[in-house]
Amino acid sequence: MEHSHNYMQLQPTFSIITITYNAVRLVEQTLLNVLSQSYPNIEYIVIDGGSTDGTADIIRRYESGLAYWVSEPDKGIYDAMNKGLQKATGDYVWFINAGDTLCSSDTVQSVVSRLQKRKALPDIIYGETNIVDEERRSLGLRRLRAVSYTHLTL
């Protein structure tokens, strides 16, 4: 399903949600990557599952750039994701786990530029994932198949 829009005025807000738990070695690169995005309409939400390894201390250092963050026990990744979704107010939601990064500081802007070329807004946006090792060397792309609404409904 797509929605009509005035593509010249399109400036959607992206709610980017990072879920983390005891990721002290990984979370900072993700925070810096999202906070360095050139696109201005980003609502960044971080949900930490009550880490005990210093993860929350790192998140706290960047809280001025966050729309919301919390560090508290949860019932697992899906509970944490739902907490993030409850706080999200954007037009689109984008999950980026601790340790993951966007391709460049212009990734969100590139997505918006592509949206502006469309005649209608999509309900779902997805792309390829570049799998990398600890040294950030590419191990290959993971391509998603086209999404069908029949698979998304109950």
Regions found by a protein language model. Name each.
Residues 1-33:
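N-proximal low-complexity "stem/linker" segments adjacent to membrane-targeting elements
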Residues 33-41:
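Short, acidic, metal-binding catalytic loop of nucleotide-sugar glycosyltransferases
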Residues 42-50, 70-71:
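Short beta-strand/loop segment that forms part of the nucleotide-sugar
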Residues 48-57, 97:
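A conserved acidic beta->alpha catalytic loop
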Residues 72-88:
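Glycine-rich, basic loop-to-helix element that forms the pyrophosphate-binding segment
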Residues 93:
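Short aromatic/hydrophobic "clamp" motif used to bind/position activated sugar donors
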Residues 105-139:
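Conserved donor NDP-sugar-binding/catalytic core segment of glycosyltransferases
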Residues 150-154:
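Conserved small/polar residues in nucleotide/adenosyl-binding loops
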